[in-house]
Amino acid sequence: KDGDKILDIGAGAGEYSLYFARKGYEVSALELADANIAAFKKKLTPEDKIDLVQGNALDLSRYADKSFDIVLLFGPLYHLKNDADKQKCISEAKRVCKDGGKIFFAFISNDFVFLTEFGYDVNYFSNGDYDKETFKLNDFPFVFHTVGAARKLLADGGINILHEVASDGASELLAARINEMSDEDYTQYLRYHFYICEKPELLGMTNHLLFMGEKK
C-alpha cells in the first residue's frame, strides 16, 4: 500500500529496488557484492530515493526491529549453504519486519533444473554435477531447494506461508519459442502461466520458487 517501507535484502543490481522506488515506495537496499553495488549505482538517478548500503544478509543490525512493511529475500537463499546461516538470514528478516508485514523468499528449485540443463546439454543426465542417487544438485555458489525443503526451512524459521509460486515455470527451457511469439500469443501465455503458477501439483516444475509469508 502507499507509504509502505520495503527492505530489499541481497538487492543485486537493483532491479526490484528501482521498480518499487519508482512506484513511490520508501526503499532500503542491502547488497554484499562490490560488482552489484557498482552496477546498482550506475542505474540510480537523482530522483531515485533509495537507501543503498553494502552489507551482509546475516547482519541487519543497521535496521531497527519492526521497521519495514515488506521484506524481500530474492537472492541470499540462492547462495547460503549451511542451515545455520539460512536460519540466521530468515531470523534477521523477521526481526526487521513489522508485525503483520509480509516477507518474500526466493529459492532456486532443485528438481526442474535438470530439464533446463538437458535443454543445453544432451548428456547432462550422465555427466551433470548432481548426486546420481538422490538427484540433489551440486553447483555451489548456487544452492538448490526442493519445494519440500523450502517449506521446511521456512516453517523451522517461524514463517507462516501464505502463497507458494512457481515463479518462471518452463520459461528458460522454452525461451527460444517464447521469443518467437506474437504479442497476442505472449499475452495469452502469461495468462496461462498465472493460471498454473500456484497449482500445488506444478510447484516443482520451475527454475525459481517464490514464497510469501509472515511471522508466526
Regions flagged by a language model, labelled:
Residues 141-158, 164:
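Short alpha-helix
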